């Protein structure tokens, strides 16, 4: 997320716009109330990277006619420009990778239940595994938060079960960090005894000390596309209905996934 924000800041700066960064999920009534002075004052447009499926901010900005682009996520609100990956496909790719390595006991430690990224990635994984012959009831799924603490607590419950998973799909790379810490605490060797895959390919994922297998998002393209969409909207250069940009993903296999060994 930090890289995305830096790239967005650069893109808008080059176009002559002043950028204000709001560190808030902005997905409840109190957040909407605190944002109103900004909306009423000088807000020309907004790039929203933390929207929930029913975000009141999205509805309010649409009602007021303020240009808005959602990145990474989508909402239930129609008529909003979005720039994201196909998260259902991304979840399926993570499941396919683990299944082809021989894993059959696969668990999902996801982010919030009210975000499209978590819901879609989980659905993609479950659907692919179902098509491959696994029952949904045999694939443990727990929604939590996009934090390492959440990944840790969810994974501790997974790994303490009678038949623990041999592979865990983490909702993002930050959750995966918690999964790895839980495995370490339980004395489980990654990837020999447990394979772990995340999403996003954060800079830390490629560290030689971590080597996290992950699904990479094209963050640079995402930032450029979102900035261009919003700038065009703010300048009145587009009047067509909402555009939904779906960007490609890439499986980056590193050191946290391996062949299942009985």
What role is predicted for each listed range?
Residues 97-106:
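Glycine-rich phosphate/diphosphate-binding loops that line cofactor/substrate pockets in enzymes
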Residues 156-262:
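Flexible loop/turn connectors
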Residues 1-3, 21-30, 83-93, 109-156, ...:
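Hinge/beta->alpha junction and helix N-cap segments in small-molecule ligand-binding domains
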Residues 12-15, 129-136, 161-164, 185-190:
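Short helix-capping segments at alpha-helix termini
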């Amino acid at each position: 997320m930090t890289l995305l924000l830096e790239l967005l800041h650069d893109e808008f700066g080059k176009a002559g716009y002043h950028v204000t960064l709001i560190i808030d999920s902005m997905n409840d009534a109190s957040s909407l109330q605190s944002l109103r002075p900004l909306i009423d004052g000088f807000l020309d447009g907004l790039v929203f990277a933390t929207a929930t499926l029913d975000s009141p901010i999205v509805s309010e900005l649409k009602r007021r006619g303020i240009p808005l682009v959602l990145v990474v996520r989508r909402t239930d609100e129609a008529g909003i420009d979005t720039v994201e990956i196909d998260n259902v496909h991304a979840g399926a790719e993570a499941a396919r990778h683990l299944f082809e390595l021989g894993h059959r006991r696969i668990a999902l430690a996801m982010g919030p239940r009210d975000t499209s990224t978590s819901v879609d990635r989980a659905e993609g994984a479950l659907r692919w595994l179902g098509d491959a012959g696994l029952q949904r009831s045999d694939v443990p799924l727990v929604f939590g938060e996009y934090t390492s603490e959440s990944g840790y607590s969810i994974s501790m419950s997974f790994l303490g079960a009678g038949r623990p998973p041999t592979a865990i799909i983490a909702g993002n790379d930050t959750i995966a960090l918690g999964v790895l810490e839980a495995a370490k605490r339980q004395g489980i060797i990654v990837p020999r005894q447990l394979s772990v895959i995340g999403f996003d390919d954060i800079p830390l994922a490629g560290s030689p000390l971590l080597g996290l297998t992950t699904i990479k998002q094209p963050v640079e393209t995402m930032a450029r596309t979102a900035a261009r969409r919003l700038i065009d909207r703010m300048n009145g250069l587009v009047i067509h209905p909402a555009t939904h940009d779906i960007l490609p993903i890439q499986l980056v296999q590193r050191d946290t996934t391996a062949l299942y060994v009985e």
